[in-house]
Amino acid sequence: MELIIAKVKEGDMAAFNVLIDEHKAMAFTLALKLMQNREDAEEVAQDAFLKAYKNIHQFAGNAKFSTWLYTIVYNTALTRLRKKKLQTTDLDFHQEENLASYSESDKEWHRLQKSERSGYIKEALGLLSTEDQVVITLFYLNENSLQEICEITNWELSNVKVRLHRARKRLLKALEQLLDTEVRSLL
């Protein structure tokens, strides 16, 4: 990775394309979680990569390149959100299950259940604040460490821990309310 970054610092666009290919999915995912729509997320990701290219000389290598890039994506998205005054994000949880041992009808049933669970999680996350959604996205979906979340968001470690704990509690409460409403509507 260091060699690729050194080449990018020398102006090698092919090396930068390697960095883009390696990080575009995660950058887009984070942007999508923050922006709520595909078009804005694509623009944020593109803007972030342009900023990264223009400022690659500032990357000192103290943290992982991905952490540095996600910080740029995060800040670019927040700037755009402030301009557009968007308030919530849509989070898409993808949980993998091993369905190989099930019959076709069982597989379809499990897919339906998974889709339904995912829908409830998305809806519950939509009820949370942007900060709660960001910390959950970074920790659970992007699998960033607590330290990496600190670097991306400029929050203190204790603050990240508290926010993550509270975000989980709020998510659970939102899910309970949604499911309670769903059960009551069936009765």
Predicted regions and their residues:
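Sigma70-family region 2
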Residues: 9-10, 36, 49-64, 83-85
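Structural recognition of an alpha-helix C-terminal capping motif at a helix-to-coil junction
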Residues: 29, 43-50, 63-75
